[in-house]
Amino acid sequence: MSIAITDDHRALAGTASDFLTRRDARGAARALLEAPDEALPPFWDDLVGLGWLGLHVPEEHGGSGYGLEELVVVVEALGRAVAPGPFVPTVIASATLAAVGGEIAKTHLPGLADGSVAGAVALGGAVTVDGDTAIGSAGAVLGGGLAQLLLVAAGDDVAVVEMGEGVSVETPPNMDPTRRTARVTLDGAPATVLPGARRTLVDLARVILAAEAVGLARECTEQAAAYAKERIQFGRPIAMFQAVKHHCANMVVATELATSAVWDAARAAASGGDQLTYAAAVAATLAAPAADLCANLNTQVHGGIAITWEHDAHLYLRRATTLLPLLAADTAAAELTDLTREGVARARTVELPPEAEAIRDEVRAFAERIRDLSPDDQRTELIDSGYAMPHWPTPWGRAAGAVEQLVIEQEFAAAGIARPAYGITGWVILTLIQYATDDQVARWVRPALDQEVVWCQLFSEPDAGSDAAGIKARATRVEGGWLVNGQKVWTSGAHLAGMGFATVRTNPDVPKHEGITTVVIDMHADGVEVRPLRMTTGGSEFNEVFFNDVFVPDDDVVGPVDGGWTVARATLGNESVSIGGGQGGMSMPGSG
């Protein structure tokens, strides 16, 4: 998924992608590889005409009046096309001036927004300002060779310098000739100081550069996956080889994490302050390594062809490599650690559609009614009303969709109401609701919701971890039920649980997925032995569990005999959703 998730943003992304494809932005980048000098790309005037340089600039300064949320959509598309030109440094400069405001914004924003002025930014260097002049090396300046306006960090401040008197620009050979950085030295250059603006400049630069990194990462991921599907070796597509699969999967994971971080950071720009600093640091920490990883793995998946001059892989590798020092992920991560130690955390808010308000009235009224009840009475009301686990089917939940669930979270948080935390018990009980008989549901569900009984999940074995169907614990038919023998391991909370949900092998003579049955085991029954495993922390949260002729009555078999794999897979799915929603760990009485 790209940064664009709304209909309007997806339309903008599509327009940007189509434009860059039609104007052959990647070809324009390639043309600069051996060009002696950097020039504006041939599509620059058309790009300016689309108004993208002013997307985020207030209307009174010649922009469109949108925000960073729209800007990063375009920047991601530019990254995917490895587009040349000073777009990125120009919009970093204009975003900073727009955030600071004042007379300097009135002076410079119109030119930056209409493309008559190109911007450059310097985040490092050693520049000092004495009165109204700037002195020192600005270091590596992105866009310095094409710019008319420079924003350079100077201590905690930012110096705004018009290229001209007192400014020396040298463009040495670049790792990425398609978008070059320059060495800029200031020697008494006239400067306007933006007091305390360095933080704003760095934050906004991180968000915008990270958006470009996401575009690079996503394009490299898609190129690698497409090539792996079509490249045949040893009589099959290389996409069928595990090592290649893992490369592509790692690329997807890195890209999606970075995408989410940039999306969130762009939203944080409206808040500014620590919220923006925190989110921008997260984006930089994730996006720079993602682009670097994906550019390198794209080269590896393509093999020898990717290290030829004619292939485009090295264009992406060059751009990703130059983004590493600009985004400085290690520095961002260290700052993020400091912010966390200071108690800064990201405020989580989501803009909900209009239909949320009708739901909100009902939820708020319920929350107000139960907020002053005792914890036990409050839990009972939550269970009876379905609010304890609102996404569960009725009558145990409310069959709530995503919008209703978010409204419930918001209103309960505002009222100080904590829903019970069921953890493993929750996802096991949901499976029972889905697959158990009415009698079994009546026996097991409500006591678990009341937190009278804690459950554990008895799936993993010494030889069946990720291969959950490779279990050897066996159940042998006896009068009235089954005798279970075998071992489970890594069973979280087995030492605390009253009941366990287990996979056992009831038919060893069929393929492994077909001979599995799911059963409920009383953890205090004769023949059950739980041995806690000591962890690196010194504590014990998971266990070995041994079964020695443990009797399980027929009434405690869940689903069809030999048909338990379907039930087990449902449980694993419920586990993933629960953990992803923050419902991990163990349920204990009074937990919330």
Predicted regions and their residues:
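Glycine-rich phosphate/cofactor-binding loops in nucleotide/flavin-utilizing enzymes
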Residues: 2, 73, 92, 304-368, ...
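A short core secondary-structure module
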Residues: 122, 137-168, 172, 485-533, ...
